[in-house]
Amino acid sequence: MPKLKTRKAALKRYKKTGAGNFLRRHAYKGHLLMKKSNAQKRKLSQRVCVSSGDSKPIKLMLPY
């Protein structure tokens, strides 16, 4: 049986934790940052866990 391929786009966007959850970055942090406050930019810099409903397709894209 051939090996399962990893979706490289998902590999760049998500990081797997030890508990099996996935971490993702916030949106709205790429450009147009002058109008955002420092507190908002600092909050957007943190990583957040992917919701349980969205994690099932990510598990299929990242088999290893």
From Swiss-Prot:
Pfam families: Ribosomal_L35p. It is found in: Plastid, Chloroplast. GO terms for biological process: translation. It comes from the Eukaryota. Belongs to the bacterial ribosomal protein bL35 family. Gene3D superfamilies: 4.10.410.60. It comes from Thalassiosira pseudonana. NCBIfam families: rpmI_bact. Keywords: Chloroplast, Plastid, Ribonucleoprotein, Ribosomal protein. One of its GO terms (cellular component) is large ribosomal subunit. This is Large ribosomal subunit protein bL35c. GO terms for molecular function: structural constituent of ribosome. The gene is rpl35.
